[in-house]
Amino acid sequence: MAKTLYQKLFDAHVVHEAPNETPLLYIDRHLVHEVTSPQAFDGLRAHGRPVRQPRKTFATMDHNVSTQTKDINASGEMARIQMQELIKNCNEFGVELYDLNHPYQGIVHVMGPEQGITLPGMTIVCGDSHTATHGAFGALAFGIGTSEVEHVLATQTLKQGRAKTMKIEVNGRAAPGITAKDIVLAIIGKTGSAGGTGYVVEFCGDAIRALSMEGRMTLCNMAIEMGAKAGLVAPDETTFNYVKGRLHAPKGQDFDEAVAYWKTLKTDDGAQFDAVVTLNAEEIAPQVTWGTNPGQVIAVSDAIPDPASFADPVERASAEKALAYMGLKPGVPLTDVAIDKVFIGSCTNSRIEDLRAAAEIARGRKVAPGVQALVVPGSGPVKAQAEAEGLDKIFIEAGFEWRLPGCSMCLAMNNDRLNPGERCASTSNRNFEGRQGRGGRTHLVSPAMAAAAAVTGRFADIRSLK
C-alpha cells in the first residue's frame, strides 16, 4: 500500500499497538529546556527512576535567559530557579546541557539542527510547541507537555494517536525577497489558524524544494500556527548536505548508509492525503499580520481589512476584536502604520540566513528615531558566524541592539518585552494578545521586512526599498 511520509515515519517507530489502544512510539531524540522540565525530573526522582536514554536527551537554556548578560540572576527569581534546577537535574541524571557559558547554548530548535542532533527519519519531542521545526529534516517532531516529558525521560517512548494527513503544495517560483516566512504566512492566511487541526502537514512543490534548510525550518516551525500537529518536508540533497559533518551526524560509511535510508523517506506515488491545499508562489507578496492570530494576515501593499467584509460571523467578530486590541482602523494602508519596536530573532527566524537578510536592509541605513530594534541570534554558533561576517557591525552602526542568544522578545518570559500599547514588527511566530508583553501589539513579518520597518519607522515594502 502506498504510504505518505508521515505514515512511514509513524509506522517505523511503533513499539506496541493493540486494538482499542493508542499506539506506543519510540522516541529517537528528546530536547529539554528550563521551563517545562523541572517537574518532570522531580517525578523521576520521586519514583527512583533514571533517565532511560541520557545519550538521546539534550538540554539547553533559552526561554527565560537574559540576552544582555550571562548572569543567571538577570531575568528574576523564577528564571534563576528554573535554570539552576536544569543544571542540577542534568548533572544528576547524566544529560548533556548547553548552559549559558557553553558555546553551543541557544534556542532549542536552533541548537538541535545545528549540532546534528536532528536527523531525517527520527521522532523528536520537546516540551515546546514549536518542536515542529525539526520536521524540515523529514523527522516526525512535535511538542509535548510536562507529564509527557517525564514519560519520555523514563521510558524513551510516548503514546501517540495517528493524525490525519494534509499536503500543502506551493508551486512556481517565489519572487526575489519573498522568504519562507512570507510563504508560511500566506499558507496560514489561506487555511486559517485552525485549518490544520488534527493533521500532520507535508509541505511540497517547487517553491518548497527551492528553500534552504533554514527556510524549511521556518516553514515547519509555523505548521503549529495553522493548528497542525507537525510539519514535514521530505529530505533531499539539500538536507543531506546540511547534515553532513555536523557534531552528532553519522560519519564516513555510516553517513552513506544513513543517506541510502533517508532517500526512501518520501511520500509514495499514489498515496492518499486526507486534505490538499495548493498555492502559487508567484502570487505571494511580503506578508504582515494585522490581527491577533497568524491567519489574520495580508500583503504589505494592502490596507487593513474591514470586519464587515468577512462573510463568516465568527471571523467578523474576531476581526472586530483584533482591530480594537491592535488599535487599527479599517482601510488604513499597512505602510501608514508606525511601529515602536522591532524584534529580529526567535526559533522561527534567528539563523544566519535570517540575519544576513536583515543586515542587507540595515546596511548604510539608520534605525528610525523613537524605534528600539533588537537583533537576537538563535545560538552561540549563529552569533559567532554573524560576527565573523561583520553582520554585528552593520546592525550596531545602524542603531540596532546586538544581543546574546535566547528566546528573547518572542514571549514575555524574560526582560525583553513590549509595554502596553507598543507596536512591534516581529520575526517570531505568535501574535496573540499579550504574547510579547501585556497590551503589546505584535505584527509577524520576515527578517528583511522587520529591518525595513526599523529603518523607516513603519511597515515598508522591501520591494520598493533601494
Curated annotation (Swiss-Prot):
Q: Which cofactor does it need?
A: [4Fe-4S] cluster
Give the reaction(s) catalysed: (2R,3S)-3-isopropylmalate = (2S)-2-isopropylmalate
A Gene Ontology molecular-function term?
Answer: 4 iron, 4 sulfur cluster binding
- InterPro entries, sorted: 3-IsopropMal_deHydase_lsu, Acnase/IPM_dHydase_lsu_aba_1/3, Acoase/IPM_deHydtase_lsu_aba, Aconitase_4Fe-4S_BS, Aconitase_4Fe-4S_dom, IPM_dehydratase_rel_enz, IPMI_cat
Q: Which UniProt keywords apply?
A: 4Fe-4S, Amino-acid biosynthesis, Branched-chain amino acid biosynthesis, Iron, Iron-sulfur, Leucine biosynthesis, Lyase, Metal-binding
User: One GO biological process from the UniProt record?
Assistant: L-leucine biosynthetic process
- Describe which pathway this protein belongs to, using the record's wording: Amino-acid biosynthesis; L-leucine biosynthesis; L-leucine from 3-methyl-2-oxobutanoate: step 2/4
| Superkingdom, natural source | Bacteria
Query: Any binding details for the cofactor?
Result: Binds 1 [4Fe-4S] cluster per subunit.
What EC number(s) are associated with this protein in UniProt? Answer: 4.2.1.33
Q: Which residues bind [4Fe-4S] cluster?
A: C347, C407, C410
Q: What function does this protein fulfil?
A: Catalyzes the isomerization between 2-isopropylmalate and 3-isopropylmalate, via the formation of 2-isopropylmaleate.
Q: What is the similarity comment for this entry? A: Belongs to the aconitase/IPM isomerase family. LeuC type 1 subfamily.
By its UniProt entry, which PANTHER family does this protein fall under?
3-ISOPROPYLMALATE DEHYDRATASE (PTHR43822:SF9), HOMOACONITASE, MITOCHONDRIAL-RELATED (PTHR43822)
Question: Which NCBIfam families is this protein grouped with?
Answer: leuC, PRK05478.1, PRK12466.1
- Tell me how this protein assembles: Heterodimer of LeuC and LeuD.
This chain belongs to which protein, by name?
3-isopropylmalate dehydratase large subunit
